[in-house]
Design a protein with these regions (language model features):
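Substrate-binding/active-site clefts of carbohydrate-active enzymes
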Residues: 3-37, 41-152, 173-181, 195-197
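Active-site-proximal helices and loops of the catalytic beta/alpha 8
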Residues: 88, 144-147, 160-245, 262-266, ...
């Protein structure tokens, strides 16, 4: 699998909050980022305007009707499914595939349909009721839901909290729907690392979040003083699973890089970005506005709210800049260009399909290389090789990085020592062959 880029977006917070706001200009913008899949979050109809609902309009994960879409997303609510079909057609015509959410664990308390459910919820998800997967009606309906959306042209599903659902049921569902729609992809939200291989090899998911792996590792390096060596330990643990995990630095559940609760400045996210995007052949997910520094400041916890109407300024400015409005602010434009450059590089064969050589093990004795705050690796094919040097510190680093003989034997014409000047919390990408 070549490296795929997934772009997650909540249509309710883009433009005027309508399906139609994902127009040709918006989709052309995604083309400049090298996106392959657009994950439209919050499409199936969820509960709103009820006492149990969290926020206004409410959570996209409290579904009240699995065969409908949210009326507020349509220009004409009476045509809302037709307008979603038109969004699918526009997105496909622009060269992208479409993901939507599949939420097998729960529904909203006011759900009416064949899914059997209990009168209790998991944790603090008080706007939901737990699904009863022991009921044949639940299993049949959850399969029919997948077929309903796949038949409309949806290309895959991001599957919510799958560890809370019987694995054998999910395995049967995936096998059954793929018999009819073999090109569908299923992306699993899995948190227990010991379950990774099971959900990929046995249950049948195509990709799964590496939240508890690389995301948590990079966050600890950035925020808790953890050693950068732990990045090595994570990919070593993943081993052959690396191409089938989905790396990310932001999504709707996590705090924004630029939020005070994370890095405080989105520009400090370039070092972790280089590792998450470029270290291996894992797939990568980008959360809308991340590339221009959206900081979640309009919320109370550093997240862009999935519960309430909001007007994130960076998203507003990005949309306006694509539709004849003012250009992005210089700092936003500069960050966007850095993202574009790295995303473009990620599509080159050396990064999309090539080998990785982690250089930390052979540079611990180099006087300018601090293996706790610096991380370096080479990505290579027979035709080219790139050095990526990351600086997780507040001080600039003038690094001299040793390239071991084993690597040079595999990649002729590489230097024995490479030099890289890396700004604080930044990454340097150098073609060395």
């Amino acid at each position: 699998m070549s490296k795929k880029i997934i772009y997650q977006a909540l249509p309710r917070l883009w433009g005027r909050g309508k399906f139609s706001d994902w127009d040709e200009a918006s989709l052309r913008y995604l083309q400049t980022l090298g996106v392959d899949y657009v994950w439209y979050t919050g499409v199936p109809r969820h509960a709103t305007g009820k006492p149990f609902v969290k926020g206004n309009p409410g959570s996209p994960y409290a579904i009240t009707d699995w065969r409908d879409v949210n009326p507020y997303l349509a220009e004409d609510p009476a045509r809302r499914l037709a307008e979603f079909d038109e969004l699918l057609a526009r997105t496909h015509a622009a060269g992208f595939k479409v993901l939507i959410d599949y939420i097998p664990n729960h529904v909203a308390p006011d759900y009416q349909g064949p899914i059997c459910r209990f009168d209790w919820c998991d944790g603090d998800w008080t706007d939901t009721c737990k699904n009863d997967w022991s009921a044949a009606g639940t299993r049949a309906e959850m399969l029919d839901i997948l077929r309903f959306w796949a038949s409309r042209g949806v290309d895959g599903f991001r599957c919510d909290m799958v560890e809370l659902v019987p694995a054998d049921a999910l395995q049967a569902l995936i096998a059954a729907v793929k018999a009819d729609f073999p090109d569908l992809i299923f992306v699993a939200e899995v948190y227990q690392k010991d379950n990774y291989r099971r959900y990929l090899d046995e249950v049948g998911f195509d990709l799964l979040y590496d939240k508890s792996g690389l995301y948590d590792t990079l966050r600890a390096v950035c925020c808790s003083g953890a050693t950068a060596r732990s990045i090595t330990w994570n990919w070593q643990w993943l081993a052959d699973l690396q191409p089938r995990v989905l790396n990310f630095l932001e999504n709707h559940d996590e705090q924004r890089l630029g939020s005070p609760e994370f890095l405080g400045d989105a520009r400090r996210g370039l070092a972790p970005l280089a590792c998450s995007l470029l270290l291996n052949t894992a797939q990568f997910m980008l959360y809308f506005g991340q590339e221009v520094g959206e900081d979640g400041i309009e919320g109370a916890d550093g997240r862009t709210s999935i519960f309430n109407w909001s007007d994130p300024p960076e998203l507003r400015e990005l949309y306006a800049s694509l539709h004849g409005g003012p250009a992005l602010a210089p700092d936003e434009a500069a960050l966007l260009e850095r993202y574009r450059a790295m995303l473009s590089l990620a599509k080159r064969p050396a990064f999309a399909e090539g080998g990785t050589w982690d250089l930390v093990y052979c540079n611990g004795d180099m006087p300018r290389f601090d293996p706790d705050r610096h991380f370096a690796f080479v990505r290579y094919t027979e035709q080219e090789a790139w050095l990526v040097a990351c600086n997780f510190s507040d001080r600039p680093a003038a690094l001299r990085i040793r390239l071991p003989r084993e690597l040079r034997d595999r990649c002729p014409r590489l230097p024995e020592i490479a030099s890289a000047y890396v700004k604080p919390w930044d990454a340097r990408l150098l073609r060395i062959r």
